[in-house]
């Protein structure tokens, strides 16, 4: 009798191989972490450089016109949060920002979504930019005042870090509303599955 075909394979092995073959382009988490860090470095660098230039060139508290009185360079020292909110709680804001930075690094280990990498990178870069001021500017560590220098209309004076943090947060809210998770590629189904691909942990 002819030998029986030996092409059959263990079902579990076949399933795993098929799953692996179906995800040849699934981005590995380290790749997205690198993207997150790259965005953060760009934001942080822009924030630090523009603050140094502002401190060197702008007279404190005296607006320098860019577009009439609507858009001006105005150098101020801010003890509060983004856009001069919560002044007087400098050390609390410093601790919160530090916690945000730690949390983003923790999420970055499992990050798969490129859009989440962009949003988290914007928040990380902005948070670190203002933390540099909190730790290294007067009146002292944890109490340092943040340098703000751009005024637009009635909006409080701000710096590069502020719109980066707010813009990144808005992006993450939009992604969450539309069902995009940080550790998936694609959208969630109503039952919790994803339309895209979920990268296995580890």
Swiss-Prot record:
Q: Recorded GO terms, molecular function? A: aspartic-type endopeptidase activity; endopeptidase activity
What's the domain of life for this entry? Answer: Bacteria
**Keywords assigned by UniProt, alphabetized:** Aspartyl protease, Cell membrane, Hydrolase, Membrane, Protease, Transmembrane, Transmembrane helix
E.C. no? 3.4.23.36
Active-site positions, per UniProt?
148, 162
Against InterPro entries, the record matches this protein to: Peptidase_A8
The GO biological-process annotations, alphabetized, read as:
protein modification process; proteolysis
Could you tell me the membrane topology recorded for this protein? Multi-pass membrane protein
* Ranges that cross the membrane: 35-55, 88-108, 112-132, 160-180
CC per GO annotation:
plasma membrane
Q: In which pathway does it act?
A: Protein modification; lipoprotein biosynthesis (signal peptide cleavage)
Q: What class of enzyme is it?
A: hydrolase
Places the protein is found:
Cell membrane
> Catalysed reaction(s)?
Release of signal peptides from bacterial membrane prolipoproteins. Hydrolyzes -Xaa-Yaa-Zaa-|-(S,diacylglyceryl)Cys-, in which Xaa is hydrophobic (preferably Leu), and Yaa (Ala or Ser) and Zaa (Gly or Ala) have small, neutral side chains
Provide the residue span(s) of the region labelled Disordered: 1-29
Q: Give the similarity note.
A: Belongs to the peptidase A8 family.
Role noted for this protein: This protein specifically catalyzes the removal of signal peptides from prolipoproteins.
Q: Which NCBIfam families match?
A: lspA
According to UniProt, the name of this protein is Lipoprotein signal peptidase
**To which species is this protein native?**
Mycobacterium tuberculosis (strain ATCC 25618 / H37Rv)
